[in-house]
Every structure is written in C-alpha cells, then in structure tokens.
Amino acid sequence: MSRATLVIMAAGIGSRFGGGIKQLAPIGPNGEIIMDYSVYDAIEAGFDKVVFVIRKDLEKDFKEVIGNRIAQKVEVAYAYQEVSDIPAEYAEKFVGRTKPWGTGQAILCCKDVVSEPFLVINADDYYGKSAFKEAYSYLTSIPSADKIQVCMVGFVLKNTLSENGGVTRGICRVDENGMLQEIIETHNIEKDGDKAVVREGDIETEYDADSPVSMNMWGLTPEFFAILKNGFEQFLNKTDMEDLKAEYLLPTIIGELLKEGTVSVKVLKSEDQWFGVTYKEDRETVVEAVKSLIDKRNLSGQAVRLNRVHIKNRTFEKRKKELLKCQRNKNRPEIPDEKIKLRENMRRDPEKMVSENSV
C-alpha cells in the first residue's frame, strides 16, 4: 500500500478564547476531541502516519492528552513551530515578534519528518470522511507532470458557515476540468437563511452558497518544501520589521504559484458538512452535529478514545466476575483486600462503580 501522512497544524492551541484550549475541548459522547475524529477518519481512509505541528512548550501536555494515545494506533511524529525559527540573518530584524508566522511556516517545519505525500489540516476543524478518502486516493496516485501537483479539498460554502457570526472563506474559481484557477479571500460572510451574504454598512453582497471554498485541507508532496523555504526567505526579506502581524499563509503562497504557472491544483469535491470552532458558541453546534452524524452512522462515536475505554471496561468486568466467584466459593479461606474493598463499593453504589471504571 502506498504511504501518505496526515499533518495536523496544532501550534495555535490555547491562543484564542482567553487561553481556553479549544482543540482539546470534548465534543464527542465519550470525551472525544475534534482531532480524534480527524485521525480516525484518516486512518480509515488509508493514512498510516500522523505528524502534529505544535509549540515546544505544549509538548508534554499535548502528548499526555492526545499524542501518546494516538501513537498506540498509528505512527506519530512531531514538528515544532516557533516564532524564533527563522534564518539567522533575520533574527535581529524581527526580535519583537510574538505572533506565529502562519501556515506556510507550519508546514515548512515538517520537512525533516515527512518524506511522502501528505495532507495538511487544521487541528480544530472537522472535515468529514469523504474528504480524507478523496485526498488519500489522489495522494497515492499522483500523475507525473511538468508542474508540481497539489490537491485541495473544496467544500460547499453553505456547509461551512457559522450560526454565530461572520467568517472568512477562500472562495475558489475552478475550471471545467476541476482545476483551481484562483482563491478569493472573502471576509465576514454570514449565514442568512439559505443565503451567504457580506454586509458592509447598507450594502449587502450575496455569494453563491454552493461555491467551492478552501478550508485549509491541502495535499502536497515533499518537493513542496523547497518552494516553501525559498518563499519564506523572500517573505521575510520584503516584510517590514514593524509589521509584527504579517503571516506566510499557504493559500496566498499557492495563489502566487498558480499565477506563476509553477503548480497545478486539483480541486477534490466534498459535500460533507464542515464543522469548526470559530466562536466559543460554535462548540455546542459542533457537539450536536457530531451526535447527529453518529445517529446517522456517518461518524464513529467511538473514534480512537473509546478503544481505551473498552479495555478498561473489560478489565472491570473481569474483576467483578472474580469477586462474585469468590463470594460463591465458601471453601476459600479469605478474599483479597482489594476485592473486599471493591465488593463494599459495589454494594454502596454499583452504578457509580461502573461509571467510574468506564472513563
């Protein structure tokens, strides 16, 4: 089987919503987080390696909360995105910089741990099963060509809007062959019934709600790292030292490469509903959406986390059977202290005991 890697950009954990780690907030019935579902769907599609792009200071907590658990199911590697990780000649120029450099640098950080075609996603977005299947199929059968081959999973605009406010989306212009021609970054798109609109004062502009949009789900090959490296140095060179918010962003990079004729970008269509946490209030929407998908059997409510829960449940049931056997065996001289304690706890509140040993 051909190899393909999933790269999850998670260096921004904790930087929004007053320090709340939104990516790690449970959204599934068994405590799953959004990344659980992304990894689960990716493994089902065929991806056999996951690379987490994180900050070094988050490594310990990240591994404890999700990384070590995922590593039991699939090969895991880490790449570290730091503001200071720039060529030495630019260090003094941007000495006051605290804002991350953007998705382009995040991917560039993976160059030493990725040597196969890879799919890039955001840590706090849910993309749906079909998106991973389409991407894996493309990445494991990339045709040879003069230009660098890239793919992008395009989502339907109306399937990506928030009920809680305006969002920024990259609206895509695609030709009749499904090739990307242009990405138009559009701000403050609001959901208005079945419409997608942008309001500026008294002026309201309506957009085709069925337009394909980019949600930062890109399929790339290792040769893209050289392009990113050269482009990042050019970006740093032309960025003013006082511009502490400028970012090296993948959609912008690919847009420029399209104009130069350096790359070809195949747009893979997905009709799946996209879910993400743009606003704090979006979390409840995501929780309900996940529950609905599970009820429709389009999503595993178990994901990766539940495998661990099942193991604990089996261990508990085995201990309970042993205790009951001991109680029936009157010839046994004594019951171990651990089992006596378990028996007393079960007698007081057996349902609580089952619950406590199931998470």
PLM features per residue range, with description:
Residues 1-8, 32-120, 127-128, 132-134, ...:
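Conserved N-terminal catalytic core of the sugar/cofactor nucleotidyltransferase
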Residues 2-29, 45:
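Glycine-rich N-terminal loop/short-helix segment of MobA-like nucleotidyltransferase
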Residues 310-313, 329-331, 345, 349, ...:
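Intrinsic-disorder-associated, low-complexity terminal segments enriched in Asp/Asn/His/Tyr and depleted
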Residues 264, 274-313:
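Hydrophobic helical membrane-anchoring modules
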Residues 129-218, 222:
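Conserved core of the sugar-phosphate nucleotidyltransferase
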Residues 229-262:
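A C-terminal functional module that forms or caps the active site or interfaces directly
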